[in-house]
Amino acid sequence: MELNKFDALQIGLASPEKIREWSRGEVKKPETINYRTLKPEKDGLFCERIFGPIKDWECHCGKYKRVRYKGIVCDRCGVEVTKSKVRRERMGHIELAAPVSHIWYFKGIPSRMGLILDMSPRALEKVLYFASYLVLDPKETPLLKKQLLNEKEYREAADKYGEESFEAGMGAESIKKLLQEIDLNQLSEELKENLKTSTGQKKVRIIRRLEVVESFRKSTNKPEWMIMDVIPVIPPDLRPMVQLDGGRFATSDLNDLYRRVINRNNRLKKLLDLGAPDIIVRNEKRMLQEAVDALIDNGRRGRPVTGPGNRPLKSLSDMLKGKQGRFRQNLLGKRVDYSGRSVIVVGPDLKMYQCGLPKEMALELFKPFVMKKLVETGAAHNIKSAKRMVERVQNQVWDVLEEVISDHPVMLNRAPTLHRLGIQAFQPILVEGRAIKLHPLACTAYNADFDGDQMAVHVPLSVEAQAESRFLMLAAHNILKPSDGKPVCVPTQDMVLGSYYLTIDKDGVKGEGKAFTNVDEALMAYQLGEIDIHAKIKVRLEKEIDGKMVSGIIETTIGKLIFNESIPQDLGFIDRSIAGNELLLEINFLVGKKNLGGIIDKCYRKHGPTKTSIMLDKIKAKGYHYSTISAITVSTSDMTVPPNKGELMSEAETAVEKIEKMYRRGFISDDERYERVISTWTKTTEKVADALMDNLDRFNPIFMMADSGARGSKSQIKQLAGMRGLMANPSGKIIELPIKASFREGLDVLEYFISTHGARKGNADTALKTADSGYLTRRLVDVSQDVIVRNEDCGATEGFEVSEIKEGNEVIESLSERLIGRYTSEDIIDPTSKEVLVKQNEYIDEDKAIRIEKVGVKKVKIRSVFTCNCKYGVCAKCYGMDMATAEKISMGEAVGIVAAQSIGEPGTQLTMRTFHTGGVAGSDITQGLPRVEELFEARKPKGLAIVSEVSGTVRIEETKKKRIVFIATESGEEVSYDIPFGSSLKVKNGETIGAGDEITEGSVNPHDIIRIKGVNAVKNYLLSEVQKVYRLQGVDINDKHLEVVIRQMTRKVKVEDSGDTELLPGTMIDIFDFRDENKKVEENGGRPAQARVSLLGITKAALATDSFLSAASFQETTRVLTDAAIKGKSDPLVGLKENVTIGKLIPAGTGMNRYKNIEIDPLVTETNADDENFIAEDKIEG
């Protein structure tokens, strides 16, 4: 079967004929392997005649051996001479003596069998498991069809009317008869008629029945196939039996389950042949039914069948389910060849695009390439001798390896891969030892450190794979973060400290005020020890500007001169158009971590990735060198306790004593006392910290480390030398006894004990958070994985209105931040001069965005993913700029997965806690990760706000017991809301309020917003609420990533009135399919269907996708497959997961059809090319 040739995959029920057609023979005996000869038993579960030979090209009896007998069927033992691999694909079958039901269709929720027969699952169970009789045909008797009779009632009826006068039965045979009688078309018509007149629960039941009936009607499935006469037996190599060293056998659970079925089936056959009494046969049939149930889905009904040690056996369903199931273990993530892993160590001398690969690892990974090269160069005569040379590690092998490796990028990956920068490509450099060397600037992206982390190496094999690795994945090209477009390769720690040390200046040091004729002379003076690196000096500089040599004297320091050597001098930090600025150094300020980020950002936007990566390497080298020379180190004498600490302490203690006195006299409540004590100590801690900071010298090493952003923070310095302050107890409540000591002074026993609470809670939180955050990422990926940039422009005219996001008076996200990298949806006009700032469908860059904000425009309509008209994926115009390259997005970019990763990756940085506001009930605000999850799952939030359903004027009445808010609408009617005790009101008397606005403080239920205000309002709400959570934690995520996910949550509509369409009321359907259906009907003059947009949580939305493969590999595998099989669903394979599952190239990036037929011309390059060459920005030519 050619993998890339088919376009869709269909699933359906298997008919008995189909199962027999798949099968190579019937399994008649429960035997597996003969324990003496260790050969499979004939007609057993491992029979060679049915499933194929155990050894390649060898039949069971040994009459035919060797390849030359290929395809012959042995006349003695009946085994075909072929490869043993066929035992992975050949199936068998078991002919059942009595039909049995398939547990998925009878027991699943809702029971499909029950719905189509209009019987309750309870009644069905009684019939199937031989507890009751079912009337199949009452004939002339007063009995009803499908009536249940127990043993006693059946006897009485038989005596009363005679056994032949009506037909009743039990077990799957009876159900099968009923299913065969069903006329789907007629049933469908009847149900549709009934639907028109029914209401309430009855209507819901009819719709659910109709769904099942329509599924069968539209697919090729027949209802009676839910009952099985034949059971397929999966190939033996998929349920292996292996001998352990002790001579015992280990076997797959499936073999036990199959054996039970075969045993019971054979016993039933025998009983039927003997004509055993009805009750015994019935019991045996029930046991057969139970055995088949256990085989298909053990534990779904009743107690599961257990193996040794009371462990439930793994059935066929369990083989698909969960993390260890077929989907997630073997199809979505496979182990690959040409890979290895080792510990990482730092490689400070590497270039940005290089990594160090241990020699022995490289030899093993590149073995085939080395062998080929050895034969080509004539060092070995054939592949076999080349292999021998490599295995014996002869000397010339190393030279060949060097050559092979020189142009061959490798990919490094560190688990957990939280975003796409967790896999990057590097050019390997052979190193001694057994550790991989990693460039220090690549650590941030990988979140790696060198305390024992391990990383995996993968070798891209084909020319195409190598090209993609080099042009798209090379570390030197991945300088920006895809989530917010800021640089990810910002130097850290020592490098920052070195840069800070270089650019700081000091008064009154050796050589201050000296002047030098040029930079070289100044450097020489520094090297000879004549001047200090921080001394303010004058230097004469020369520079060619517009073909003229300009010279002049500037004031600077040696450090700044050295630092500026590695920085391009045209980044725009200095306005060169002003006279006298032409010669100034570009970086003439103190450089900390923040400023470094700005320098890299400007360099990238001005000069592109290649120059930036070269600059980064220079900054790295200088940073390490000068942080070493500076000898900045930490000692206890650097932590000076502020002299006025004692004074501040006694002040605070007096204040607290005063508060306690007031409480004891009954002036204030206990809650108030607690709040006041806490605030007193918080203020005191702040005062001590300020006193400490004022007291510190600018050149204090600890201060330098914190100020530069290399390590540590103000709060840590406060704890070292000020006071530790207030701590929280395990429940998150603040303990009112502060820790007065600092680490410099040392903690006493009680203080130490109090501070352990917080530390332990921090550790527990982190562990829980990681799992929660990972699961959130997984759901996000699943809901948005098929969003790919598929068109250039969808032609959407409707835009999405954005304005700044505020929380109270604080701007969380400014308008310009929201506009950069987007296209406009209509002209943007200056409110004062009325000139057009940006035309419709024009790209907004940073300058335009800032200008729009400056002239006072408050709201702008932009092209957004929300309003994109593409049925699959999005278009480039609606998406805008690719954050990772700062250019327009290219076709085929997997923006859905990038969005999911950008939201999920910072998840671990969010807090877990629910803030308790001093024990007041009902006002706990969920924040951090749980809040994000609550929003994306569209759950009813904790701490619900009461929302007004109408617009009008507010009137508040307060009685002794409660407050009531009345809202008078324009039409004169009043709506009242009871306000629960303890909620704070957001509205005042006489205010006007809009529909959907909050009356009390708290979070709004998004389902209320979509109901009252509509779909755009809910999109806006979700977007700004998620942004608030992330921004409060200091995490920047671009809006477009959230838009992609929220769009997936609002893609489905719920049909309310089906009009003249085929749609059923109450069903969920994709908004684009819904429009198509209506268009068809309207063209023929019919009445269109009515529907309203549904808001689905990400889990629901991921399960509601068109692709059953994607949904089944996500969650609730059996439920998804049951549903898909009945509908005879066809998977169009448009998303990424489906294609990975079946092993096709993913339809994103170069796997898109438009890129499929590109030929790659092998470039002939000089080996050991310069840096610029390896990271050159060639693009793959179309």
From Swiss-Prot:
Q: Reaction catalysed by this chain?
A: RNA(n) + a ribonucleoside 5'-triphosphate = RNA(n+1) + diphosphate
Instruction: Provide the Gene Ontology terms for cellular component.
Output: DNA-directed RNA polymerase complex
Residues that, per the record, bind Mg(2+): D449, D451, D453
EC number(s) on file: 2.7.7.6
**Which GO BP terms apply?**
DNA-templated transcription
Q: Does the keyword Isomerase apply?
A: no
Q: Which parts form a coiled-coil structure per UniProt? A: none
Q: Which domain of life is it from?
A: Bacteria
InterPro entries for the chain: DNA-dir_RpoC_beta_prime, DNA-dir_RpoC_beta_prime_bact, RNA_pol_asu, RNA_pol_N, RNA_pol_Rpb1_1, RNA_pol_Rpb1_3, RNA_pol_Rpb1_3_sf, RNA_pol_Rpb1_4
Residues that coordinate or bind Zn(2+) 2: C794, C868, C875, C878
Q: Cofactor binding mode, per the note? A: Binds 1 Mg(2+) ion per subunit. Binds 2 Zn(2+) ions per subunit.
Asked if the Swiss-Prot or TrEMBL record annotates the protein with the keyword Transmembrane helix, the reply is no
Q: Which SUPFAM superfamilies match?
A: beta and beta-prime subunits of DNA dependent RNA-polymerase (SSF64484)
| Chain sites annotated for binding Zn(2+) 1 | C59, C61, C74, C77
GO molecular-function annotation terms?
Answer: DNA binding; DNA-directed RNA polymerase activity; magnesium ion binding; zinc ion binding
Cofactor(s) this protein cannot do without: Mg(2+); Zn(2+)
- What are the record keywords, sorted? DNA-directed RNA polymerase, Magnesium, Metal-binding, Nucleotidyltransferase, Transcription, Transferase, Zinc
Q: Which family does it belong to?
A: Belongs to the RNA polymerase beta' chain family.
The entry describes its oligomerization and partners as: The RNAP catalytic core consists of 2 alpha, 1 beta, 1 beta' and 1 omega subunit. When a sigma factor is associated with the core the holoenzyme is formed, which can initiate transcription.
**NCBIfam families, sorted:** PRK14906.1, rpoC_TIGR
State its role.
DNA-dependent RNA polymerase catalyzes the transcription of DNA into RNA using the four ribonucleoside triphosphates as substrates.
This chain's protein is named DNA-directed RNA polymerase subunit beta'
Organism in which the protein naturally occurs = Clostridium acetobutylicum (strain ATCC 824 / DSM 792 / JCM 1419 / IAM 19013 / LMG 5710 / NBRC 13948 / NRRL B-527 / VKM B-1787 / 2291 / W)
| Gene (UniProt) | rpoC
